[in-house]
Amino acid sequence: CKGKGASCRKTMYDCCRGSCRSGRC
């Protein structure tokens, strides 16, 4: 997963918070 913090996009492939599970935010 890529995209943490300010550069995070709310897509199923981005990690919005901490670690990514099942490819969802």
Curated annotation (Swiss-Prot):
Q: Which SUPFAM superfamilies match?
A: omega toxin-like
- Superkingdom of origin: Eukaryota
Q: Does the keyword Secreted apply?
A: yes
Q: Which GO cellular component terms are attached?
A: extracellular region; host cell presynaptic membrane
* Principal location class: secreted
What is recorded about the domains?
The presence of a 'disulfide through disulfide knot' structurally defines this protein as a knottin.
Q: What is this protein called?
A: Omega-conotoxin CVIB
Q: Which organism is it from?
A: Conus catus
